[in-house]
């Protein structure tokens, strides 16, 4: 239990520090072209690896350029983490694009579209029934 709490605390610290680096530290122009935010950090049980999930707002080209910039800045990020967080060994940083927010937005859009289609169908059914009853009378 204490180990899991420590891993969670370290992940939170890494998330906070990398978020600050994205705002002020990373000088690669490719990282600045898309809005980048750290959505989650997953630290391995042995504290050797940290998967940093990032959400990037922009076109596919902007996303790929931003990911390339982040991957090239991995050494700098790891070095800075070593300076900012006191640990015996700084974990290896692996950037992973997180598209869950985008997928969530797409799903909500589809659900809204289905809801509108259902409402339209119900209106058509009601008007069809009313016109059918008028012809019977």
From Swiss-Prot:
GO terms for molecular function: ribosomal small subunit binding. Belongs to the RbfA family. This is Ribosome-binding factor A. It is found in: Cytoplasm. One of its GO terms (cellular component) is cytosol. PROSITE patterns: RBFA. It holds the Pfam family RBFA. GO terms for biological process: maturation of SSU-rRNA. Keywords: Cytoplasm, Ribosome biogenesis. One of several proteins that assist in the late maturation steps of the functional core of the 30S ribosomal subunit. Associates with free 30S ribosomal subunits (but not with 30S subunits that are part of 70S ribosomes or polysomes). Required for efficient processing of 16S rRNA. May interact with the 5'-terminal helix region of 16S rRNA. Monomer. Binds 30S ribosomal subunits, but not 50S ribosomal subunits or 70S ribosomes. The lineage of its organism: Bacteria, Bacillati, Cyanobacteriota, Cyanophyceae, Oscillatoriophycideae.
């Amino acid at each position: 239990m204490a180990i899991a709490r420590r891993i969670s605390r370290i992940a939170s610290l890494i998330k906070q520090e990398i978020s600050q680096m994205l705002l002020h530290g990373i000088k690669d122009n490719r990282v600045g072209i898309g809005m980048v935010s750290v959505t989650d950090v997953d630290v391995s049980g042995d504290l050797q690896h940290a998967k940093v999930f990032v959400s990037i707002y922009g076109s596919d080209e902007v996303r790929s350029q931003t990911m390339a910039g982040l991957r090239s800045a991995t050494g700098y990020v790891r070095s800075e983490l070593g300076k900012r967080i006191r640990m015996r060994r700084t974990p290896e940083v692996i950037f992973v694009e997180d598209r869950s927010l985008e997928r969530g937005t797409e799903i909500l859009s589809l659900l809204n579209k289905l809801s509108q289609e259902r409402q339209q169908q119900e209106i058509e059914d009601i008007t069809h029934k009313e016109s059918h009853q008028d012809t019977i009378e």
